[in-house]
């Protein structure tokens, strides 16, 4: 039997206070992104199956195993993962400061490679920065790790 322990994640209030009701699968996707970004901030090496690349605009493209977003007891529910990515793609975060106004999808261009069981998607630099913006405070989340 696998030992279960808790892993602490910090979630920016900017993300926490977004005016959306996220589904369980959408939350799972967002929490995994927060977890990955937190590991990078802490200087930890990512799982070898995770691939992140920034383009010249510093938007980040993630390639991750689909299993990362599935429940342990439901490893074949790709339909729900696709639905959650589509939904996050249609959710807009509006950003404005003294220099810039932007209307951005939380996630862009999700693509599943069925042979490799991976999903690739892009997050705009401004959205990715929201995951790391603790200037308005943060919320501590506990993730159960097996």
Residue spans for each PLM region:
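Charged, alpha-helix-forming regions
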Residues: 1-146
């Amino acid at each position: 039997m696998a030992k279960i322990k808790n892993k602490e994640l910090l979630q920016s209030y900017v993300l926490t206070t977004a005016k959306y009701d996220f589904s369980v699968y959408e939350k799972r996707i967002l929490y995994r992104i927060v977890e990955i970004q937190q590991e990078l901030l802490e200087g930890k090496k990512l799982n070898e199956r995770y691939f992140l690349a920034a383009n010249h605009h510093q938007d980040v493209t993630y390639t991750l195993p689909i299993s990362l977003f599935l429940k342990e007891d439901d490893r074949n529910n790709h339909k729900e993962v696709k639905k959650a990515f589509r939904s996050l793609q249609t959710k807009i975060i509006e950003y404005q400061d003294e220099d810039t106004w932007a209307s951005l999808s939380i996630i862009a261009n999700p693509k599943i490679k069925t042979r490799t069981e991976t999903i690739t998607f892009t997050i705009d630099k401004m959205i990715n920065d929201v995951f790391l913006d603790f200037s308005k405070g943060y919320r501590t989340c506990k993730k159960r790790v097996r």
